Amino acid sequence: LEQKMLMALGDLHELRTARAEEKSESEEKKAELQNLEGNLTVQKQGQVATKNDRNSLLSITKNEEKKYQQLIKEQEQKEAELEREIADYERQIKVTLNASLLPPRGHGVLAYPLPDTILESCSSLLVADQKNCVTQYFGYTPFAASGAYSGKGHNGMDFRALVGTPVLAAGPGVVEATGDTDAECPRASYGKWILVRHNNNLSTIYGHLSGIDVRIGQSVSSAQRIGLSGRSGYATGPHLHLTVAITQAVQVSSFPANTCGKRRNITLPVVGSDPVSGISGYLNPLNYL
């Protein structure tokens, strides 16, 4: 009997031990489940926070984009108004022009204004070939047709050029003037500019520069570095603007520009025309490059 009681007590002890282990395992699983639920809650909260951050960022980005687009629109309107004022002023410049004094049209009459220049449109080239290519030609380009120049055509050629690219004189001559329209009318017109009078009755204007390396009255040789390209003045991106004009039609004037503020003048090269012959002082650079 004693032996049976000892065996029964042993079985009872094993049963209690098994139940204790089961309870411990159950509690561990319960704790694990609670921990998992906690992790899921944290993950869910994190996802909600991420979503909220994303929505907030998207909202901020949209607001900033809206502000940016509004600034662009205001700047375009300012430039269009200033171009209208410049055009009105240029219409008052009456000069006598003799086309026979101009050099014959031909490739190489003027040197390229940038290193590695190509006269093809950037849009027609592969990205790898888009070095200092043409972003806008002379005359009534699509951009001009959009009203960017208040009904006028583009008075020069635009070349793609990274900020700091050397700008080269298109021929031998003398630096007639330099200036910076940003000092008088920020983010409008040429920005930093150089006017060079050449020896063949042509003059060239270089605009949107980031630096000017020459002084007024200085003689320059063909392909000599005269400045650095940039995006000063009114520019949607870094580029060089090159204007070619008949020397007799070019003058540097300072005149009131309401666009720039009350009682403020803007100083820059302007180009007149011959009312008798109808010849414009602006020339297509492609005829001489």
What role is predicted for each listed range?
Residues 238:
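Glycine-rich GHKL/ HATPase_c ATP-binding element in histidine kinases
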Residues 1-58, 62:
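Amphipathic alpha-helical segments with strong coiled-coil propensity
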Residues 12, 120-121, 228:
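A generic local structural motif
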Residues 10, 17, 24, 59, ...:
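Solvent-exposed, polar/charged alpha-helical surfaces in well-ordered, non-transmembrane soluble domains
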Residues 66-198, 202-207, 211-216, 243-289:
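Extracytoplasmic/periplasmic cell wall- or extracellular glycan-interacting regions that localize
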Residues 95, 193-194, 221-233, 242:
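Short hydrophobic beta/alpha edge segments that flank linear recognition/processing sites
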